[in-house]
Amino acid sequence: MDSKITNFDVIVVGGGHAGTEAALAAARMGVRTLLLTDNIDTLGQMSCNPAIGGIGKGHLVKEIDALGGAMAMAIDESGIQFRTLNASKGPAVRATRAQADRVLYRQAIRMRLENQVNLTIFQQSVEDLILEGDKVVGAETKMGLKFYAHQVVLTAGTFLAGRIHIGLQNYEGGRAGDAPSNRLAAKLRELALPVGRLKTGTPPRIDARTVDFEAMQMQPGDDPMPVFSYMGKVSMHPEQMPCYITYTNEQTHDFIRDSLDQSPMYSDAGEIDSVGPRYCPSIEDKVMRFSERNQHQVFIEPEGLTSNELYPNGISTSLPFETQMQIVQSMKGLENARIMRPGYAIEYDYFDPRGLRPTLETQAIHGLYFAGQINGTTGYEEAAAQGLLAGMNAARRAQMKEQWYPRRDEAYIGVLVDDLITLGTSEPYRMFTSRAEYRLMLREDNADQRLTAIGREFGLVDDARWLSFEGKMETMEAELARLKQTWIHPKHAEAKKAEALMDLPLSKEQTLFDLLKRPNVSYDALATMDMFGNAVTDPTVVEQIEIEAKYAGYIARQQEDIDKLRRAENVEIPDALDLDKISGLSNEVKQKLRDHKPATLGMASRISGITPAAVSLLLIYIKKLRKTSQSVG
C-alpha cells in the first residue's frame, strides 16, 4: 500500500469518549492522525447512562472545553435536560449535568471528527501492536492491514477480553451487541504489562409507552438553563424533557434477595470476582450493603427525543432477566413496564496505571499511550479527559516537543492523572470534587482562566475561542480594577444606600470591591447606585467578579498552601533513604512508603494515609541528609 495511506504521526485505537478526544486533539495540533474504530456508526457512543457531567465530572468537561475539546459543545447541542447541582452551595462544588439525546450526541461527535483537518477515520478492529524493541511503531488490524506511527494511543474501553454476565449465563462481548478485543488483550498481556480485571454494569432499558408517569415525581430541568461550553449558548439546546423519580421498596428487595443464588457476583456458581465501581453500585450491592434501608431512589431518564427507551438510573444489575422484570414492575409507576433491553455486568482487562508516565505514555513501551477505562477509570468524562491529554502528548512527541501535564493545583485532569499514576486503583476510579485538595481554585467557572492559554500555546484552541476568551478576560480585569479604585466615604451622598445594601454602618472609606465582599451584597445590587457607573452585562464575567471578591481571603490562603507545596513538591526522596532511622514515622506510614516507592515528596503526600506531618518529617530528614553529605564532601 501507498505509504501516504499507511503512515501517520499518531494512531488512535478506539472511537469512544477517550479515543475521539485523543484523535481530535492530535489532529487539531497539526499532525497526521488516524482513528481506527470497530464501527464508525458508534463513534462517541454512550454505552451506559445518557448523561454528561455531575459532581467532579462537570469540572472535567469544563476543562476539556477550555482546552478546545469536543465534549462540552457536543452536549450543548444534544442535551435534553440541564441542571446545576449544588447550586445553593459554594462555587467550588457547583457542577453542571445534562441528560443527552444519545443519537444527537453521537451525531455531534461524528460531525466534528469527519470535518477535522489532518484526521483520517478507518473502520477496522485492531488485533496487534507493531513493536521494535521497547518502541511502538504501528498497529495491525483484523484483516492484516498495517498502519505505522511512532505514537499510538490505545483507548479500548471495556473491550479487552470483555465478558458479559446476565444471571449465571455469560458470553464474550465488548458491550451489548459488540464483539470483544480478545486477540489485542492477549497481545497486551504478552508485553508483561501489569494487568487486572474490573467490572461495570448497566440497568435494563424500559419502554416509555408502558410507564405511568403520573404516578411518579417529575423532575424538570433548571430555568434558566446552564450551558457546558464557554462557547455555548442556550439557543443550541434542543427541545427539553423532564426526568422522573420513583423508588424501590421492600418487595423489590425481597425479589433481589431471593435471586442471589442466580447472581454472578453473589452465587457460589457465579463467575464475577472482579471489583465494580464503588460509587455506582448495582442494585443487588445496594440491597446487601445497606440492608437497613427500605427504599432506594431511581431516576427515570429519557434516552432521546425520538426514542421510547428509558434509562432507570439506580438499578444497574446482572441478575437473571426474570428477576429484572420483577424488580422493575415492583416499583411505583412501572407496574406494567416492559423491558426493551436487559441489564448486564461486564468484566474487562485494565492495566495498572502506576505503569504510566504523567503524560499517559506507558513506561514500558515508548510512544504507547493509554487512555480511558484501560487505566482503571469509569465514566465518559474521565475517559475524555485522559484521551485529550494522551492525544495532545502523542502529538507533542511527534513534533519532538516537550510533553505536558497539569499539576493537581491546575486542573481536575491533573488530580485524575496524579491519583492514577501515584496510587493506582483496585476499583473503577470516579472523579469527585473531594479528591482535589485545592478545589476552590479548580472551579467550573474558571477552567478557561486556568487552561485556555495553555491550549492556545499547543494549538488546541482555535481563533474564535481565543478571541472570546481574551475579550472576557479584558472585561473582567478592567472591571475588577475599576471596583478596586472606586471609593465611597461615610459622608458620600450614597453612603446610606451602601449601608442598606450591607446591612451594616459604613464606618470608614471603602472601595466598591470591599462592599462586594459582603455576603449579602451582589454585583447587580451595587450597580443600582448612581455612583457605580456602567455595569458589566456578561453574566459569566459578573459571576467571576463576585467570586473574586467574596472568596478573596480563602483563595489567597489556598494559594499560599499551593506555593508551599510546590516548593516541596519536587524534592526527591533518595533511593537509599533508611525509613527506620526517621523517628516519628509510624510503621503504617513506613510500609506504605516502601510499597509505593514515591520518587518525590509530592508523590508521597498523595498516598492514602501519608499525613502532612509525615511529609514534614521526611522533608526535615532529607534536608539533614543533604547537609551531612555536603559537610562530608
UniProtKB/Swiss-Prot annotation:
PROSITE patterns to which the protein is assigned, alphabetical: GIDA_1, GIDA_2
InterPro entries: FAD/NAD-bd_sf, GIDA_C_N, MnmG, MnmG-rel, MnmG-rel_CS, MnmG_C, MnmG_C_subdom, MnmG_C_subdom_sf
Binding site for NAD(+): 276-290
Residues bound to FAD: G14, G15, G16, H17, A18, G19, V126, S181, Q373
Gene Ontology cellular component list: cytosol
Principal location listed in the UniProt entry: cytoplasm
Keyword NAD: yes
Subcellular location: Cytoplasm
Keywords of the record: Cytoplasm, FAD, Flavoprotein, NAD, tRNA processing
GO terms, molecular function: flavin adenine dinucleotide binding
GO biological process: tRNA methylation; tRNA wobble uridine modification
Stored Gene3D superfamilies: FAD/NAD(P)-binding domain, GidA associated domain, C-terminal subdomain, tRNA uridine 5-carboxymethylaminomethyl modification enzyme MnmG/GidA
Cofactor(s) the protein needs: FAD
Pfam family, one: GIDA_C_1st
Free-text function comment from the UniProt entry: NAD-binding protein involved in the addition of a carboxymethylaminomethyl (cmnm) group at the wobble position (U34) of certain tRNAs, forming tRNA-cmnm(5)s(2)U34.
Family statement: Belongs to the MnmG family.
Subunit text: Homodimer. Heterotetramer of two MnmE and two MnmG subunits.
Official protein name in the record: tRNA uridine 5-carboxymethylaminomethyl modification enzyme MnmG
Organism of derivation: Hydrogenovibrio crunogenus (strain DSM 25203 / XCL-2) (Thiomicrospira crunogena)
Encoding gene, per UniProt annotation: mnmG
